[in-house]
Curated annotation (Swiss-Prot):
Job description of the protein: Catalyzes the PLP-dependent transamination of scyllo-inosose to form scyllo-inosamine.
Gene Ontology biological-process entries: polysaccharide biosynthetic process; streptomycin biosynthetic process
Cofactor(s) required for function per UniProt: pyridoxal 5'-phosphate
Assembly description: Homodimer.
Protein name (database record): L-glutamine:scyllo-inosose aminotransferase
Amino acid sequence: MDSSLAISGGPRLSNREWPRWPQPGDRALKSLEDVLTSGRWTISCAYQGRDSYERQFASAFADYCGSAMCVPISTGTASLAIALEACGVGAGDEVIVPGLSWVASASAVLGINAVPVLVDVDPATYCLDPAATEAAITERTRAITVVHAYSAVADLDALLDIARRHGLPLIEDCAHAHGAGFRGRPVGAHGAAGVFSMQGSKLLTCGEGGALVTDDADVALRAEHLRADGRVVRREPVGVGEMELEETGRMMGSNACLSEFHAAVLLDQLELLDGQNARRTRAADHLTDRLSELGMTAQATAPGTTARAYYRYLVRLPDEVLAVAPVERFAHALTAELGFAVTQTHRPLNDNPLNRPSSRRRFATDARYLERVDPSRFDLPAAKRAHESVVSFSHEVLLAPLDAIDDIARAFRKVLDNVREVSR
C-alpha cells in the first residue's frame, strides 16, 4: 500500500464527508417565516402586540450566561466597542488587549479612539498572561480585555484580582467560548461585562451577530443607548403600532441593533448549543488522548475551568518535528490527508497585516497617537511561538463520530512518519 503523503501525490488517509457548519435546528425555518409575516423585522420597527424575537433572545441569553441583563448587538466587534465605552473608556485611554487574537480585539479599541496595548499570552493556554498584564498597566490604562481563546478559559482568578487592585473593569471577550464555565459560572458573567460574537463560524451563530451581558444596570443602560442611536427599550408597556424604543437624549449612540431574523436564528441555535458542546468535548478529549501518545501537547485551560467550549482544537507540535518541518507545511500536509482545513493560530497582532492603523486616515489624528497605536512597538514572544508551533482546526469537525476522530490521529501519525517529506 502506498504510504506516501497526499501532498506528494499519495492517497488521502480519509475521504470522509466531515460535518458542515452552521447547522440549522428544527425551529429556524418556521421562525424566519414568522418574522417575514410579522410586520416587524427589527427592534426599531413598531410594536406588534407580542414580544419580539430580539427581546426573547435577550432574556434567554441572559439566563444562559447567568447574567442579569443582555443587550443584543449587531456584531461581536460592535459588542466589544460598546462594552468599552459603556465601561467608561474613551479617546486616548489605554486598553489591555491579548496579543494573540483576531484583529477585532484591537480594532474595537481603535474604533473608540482608544489605544490597544498588546500584551503577551500564557504559553500553555494562549490566553492573556496575568503577569504580563500587570506589567503593562500604566496611569493611562482604563480597562482590561481578555479573550477566552480557541478552547481555553483564561486565568480569571488572577486577572480579576489584578483588575480589582488597579480599579479597572475587566471585559470578557467570549467570542470563542459560548457555554464555557469558570468556577461553576458561565464565562462572560465574571467581569464588568461579557461580550459575544455570533458570526458564522462561531459555536452560537446567526451569520452575523453579537451580545453584551452584565450584572451592572448602568453598563447595560449605556450599552442600550450606544447600540440604538441613543434610544433604549421602554420599561413600561407600549401599544400596538407604537415605538418600543424611547428617545432619552442621555447618551449619543449609533445603530448596532440585531435584526429579528438574526434573533430568531439565535433562539434556534441556543437550544442546540449544550448538546453540541458535549459532543465536541467528548471528541476533543478522545483526540487529546490519542495525540498525547505521539508527543503532541493540546491547548491547556486555566485552573478553575468547569466547562470547556471548543471553538478550535489546538495542538502544539514537538520541537524535534518543528526542527525538520515548518508548522505551516505540517498543517498543509494534514489538510491534504483529511480533506478539511488545518491551519496555524491567528497571527500575533504586532505582526498582522490586518492590524495596520496607519492604513486609515481616521486614526491619523496626530503623529503622537499614530505612534501609540503602532502595533509593531510591542514584543509578543509567546504569541509568536504559538503561531510558529501550533496547528488547529474548526469545531464542527469534533461533531463527527469517534471513529472519524481516530482518522485525525492516524493522519498525524502518517505525517509524522513522513515528516522529512513535509519539509521539501
